[in-house]
Amino acid sequence: MVTAEDIGKRVEDDSGRVGILRDVIPDYEDPSELPWRRRKQPIAFLWPEQGGREWLVPPGNVKPSLLSP
């Protein structure tokens, strides 16, 4: 699991994707959900090292990467 202390570091999600941890929000609500369907949940924001689309993962499914850059 990652925490705010890991922001800016290389991490890997449980599917094997490697990226840079941008943020961890403990009470994130997805704005794309209808207001009455939103629920607070912890979310980690990961960004591909070479650029691209950021992806969201529960912080419990992310760990520091052991792969060299």
Please place each PLM-identified region on the residue numbering:
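Mixed-charge, Lys/Arg-rich low-complexity intrinsically disordered regions
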Residues: M1-R10
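Short amphipathic beta-strand/extended segments with alternating polar/hydrophobic composition
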Residues: M1, I20-D23, W55-G60
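Short beta-strand-centered aromatic/proline hotspots
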Residues: R17-E29
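Generic cytosolic/nucleocytoplasmic N-terminal low-complexity/intrinsically disordered segments
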Residues: G8, R39, G60-V62
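Intrinsically disordered, low-complexity, charged/polar segments
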Residues: I43-P69
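Short coil/loop residues immediately preceding or within conserved phosphate-binding loops
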Residues: G16, Q41
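Short, solvent-exposed secondary-structure boundary/capping segments
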Residues: Y28-R38
